[in-house]
């Protein structure tokens, strides 16, 4: 908000001093031709006349014509010709000295000798207080020759205080009146410009004077003084003490023209920061600066009779005032063609924004009516007349401060407390109005306000209900944007992992994933463009704006504030809902990232280990995830099957079967890949080879059901958070590094089992147990015991990989699909638990046993370590019995 403003120029004419009154010409009839020489030399000190005459409150006359002019003209007509010539010559000489110029000047306000300090304050500084409280900068400075009353106008005395005291007194009174609505922060600084150096007046001078301060321009292009003392007074008494301390430190010395001459320019700056107590989410702080400047007076060396350092001080004072006059001349140009020399002096740099910037400025011109200061008064009036043409662009200083999210709840609580306090006040007003029967009009008006307030609350409630669909739509859009962010995050992670771990593979599909990512970003931007909660806020405000305006017109500002607080409370509720939607925690994305991380690590290990089939299947599954497809879990289950169409070249060499390493290579805390369960696939015990090996192969199927390993899916672990890295088997220890132990039975679970001697062309997954025992031992047991074992139905847990059918990267959530159950395919198949007791009672020689085992579909081991130990003990016992 900007306003065009002009500098307000006022003129104050001081009264004659005692010495000047003694030499003042009392009446004009004392003048004669013989005394005209004293008038031609107005500074002679003997005869003094008035050179400034105030006509009214806005116009004054400089060097008015004397009242005896008409009398002299009439007298000249009675003189002889030679005497008339002498009189004309005398008047001509007087006019050349400035006698009777009759120059008229008009200003915003003119004060004569009888004006008091209070009158000057009422017409100059008091109007600026409204601007200060509204956030506009203001400046008051006194300008004039030495001894013309500038310091008296600005500072005054204890009996007759000046503008500083009167201005700050009323400022504190207004602040106390507004403390219920606003929070104020007032800071005060006081400095002087002495011989073009800046001194801090609030710091007592010391023998080792500190380094002078410098002027700086901040980021907002405001002139500041780094290192200047800034105080925060809490009362008017503290301000008076501060001003008196600063005036005591100011440089002053007597001269011939003024007994208490100021030898420096004094600048008092008052900075006021204010903020409303009921500020919304975005707080607006108002900042305003009031500058009160007492300039040193211009002086002539011949009049002041200065020598030495005082002469040097006067030269610097005149230099700075000359720079100020040049700036005024340049600013008066309506086209601003001339450069404004602000940097010619520190005074003009300090007054830069007061003269031509963001500030309301009042210039108080102090002049002397005595002819002793004839030339100084004339020049001062000329500069003041030019300063009227200076235009300034005034802007309100607002500082926007965003509140933290944690302050929303606090703001709501404060608003509710204020509403309760206002309601209590209203209740007290109602009680007092009812008790005082004489004030019936106030009671009636209060009831009318209450009814309007109830009506406004109903309107707000209806508006809130009407905007519920719009509120829900906004919140849904915010949640959708949050879901898009999660999907974009997963896709970016997928791309980074895929390009790093699987380079140069499926470039076309990677391009499709990038296209999908760009599509998600575009759709997200479109949704964000449609989110506009301000529509809801505007509906709330418009629904009760007419009632608020009515309250303000009737002077019921309290009711207007209560209603506005309720509107702000509704806005805060909507904003909190939007923030909750933005900060909603989604547990799906971290789980999916963890799954992708494990899958990519597993694919890298599979590729390095030469397991090309598993690598291809896992790569296919990862590509499906990146393209947003819904991959079936059977894709991963294929990794546990062997290709039934493989040729003889894929037969595994029996001599290359290795045992487990003596020390586990993986962490024992990691989840196991398989649980030991009852068998559900046919198991055939083949004849022992010459190397005394025992083979359990589920590839032989001789049962009537004809169940095959190719027709039933392989069960896997049921761990929900299983990743492929934890399920990979590390390579076994080489044969030449293994310790020789004749009593050790090595067990190794292979994804591709060795070829059965009964079925050479059909490799199947199975369990290979090899023993280095020299002699084959057979276990004698009854077939009935084995039949009982085969009839037992051990409870097995259904296991499945984590479901990935719920993964959808299209930007919309998908309902969870129930877990697959692969145990139903073999529900009717008998189960068999191969544990210690079963091995002890097992008879491999009976055909019935083979027939029963061939009908099984799956072989589960309860504990392989126990089986190994039990087998060793059984073999040793049988060998002892045989010997």
UniProtKB/Swiss-Prot annotation:
Q: Where in the cell is it found?
A: Cytoplasm; Cytoplasm, Cytoskeleton; Chromosome, Centromere, Kinetochore; Cytoplasm, Cytoskeleton, Spindle
Q: Name the Gene Ontology molecular function terms of this record.
A: ATP binding; ATP hydrolysis activity; microtubule binding; plus-end-directed microtubule motor activity
Residues reported in the UniProt entry to bind ATP: 144-151
- The UniProt record lists the Kinesin motor domain at 6-390
User: What is seen without this gene?
Assistant: Simultaneous disruption of dam1 is lethal and leads to the cut phenotype (septation without chromosome segregation).
Where are the stretches annotated Disordered? 755-785
CDD domains registered for this protein in UniProt:
KISc_KIP3_like
Which biological process terms from the Gene Ontology are attached to this UniProt entry? cell division; deactivation of mitotic spindle assembly checkpoint; lateral attachment of mitotic spindle microtubules to kinetochore; microtubule cytoskeleton organization; microtubule depolymerization; microtubule-based movement; mitotic chromosome movement towards spindle pole; mitotic metaphase chromosome recapture
* SMART domains assigned to the protein according to its UniProt record, in alphabetical order: KISc
The UniProt entry, under PROSITE patterns, shows:
KINESIN_MOTOR_1, KINESIN_MOTOR_2
Gene Ontology CC annotation, any one: nucleus
Question: What keywords does the record list, in alphabetical order?
Answer: ATP-binding, Cell cycle, Cell division, Centromere, Chromosome, Chromosome partition, Coiled coil, Cytoplasm, Cytoskeleton, Kinetochore, Microtubule, Mitosis, Motor protein, Nucleotide-binding
Which positions are tagged coiled coil?
396-435, 563-588
The principal localisation class reads cytoplasm
Q: Give the superkingdom in one word.
A: Eukaryota
| Similarity field | Belongs to the TRAFAC class myosin-kinesin ATPase superfamily. Kinesin family. Kinesin II subfamily.
Cite the record's note on assembly.
Heterodimer with klp6.
Describe the task this protein carries out. Answer: Has a role in establishing metaphase during mitosis. Required for chromosome segregation where it generates tension during kinetochore capturing.
In Swiss-Prot or TrEMBL terms, this protein is called Kinesin-like protein 5
- UniProt gene name: klp5
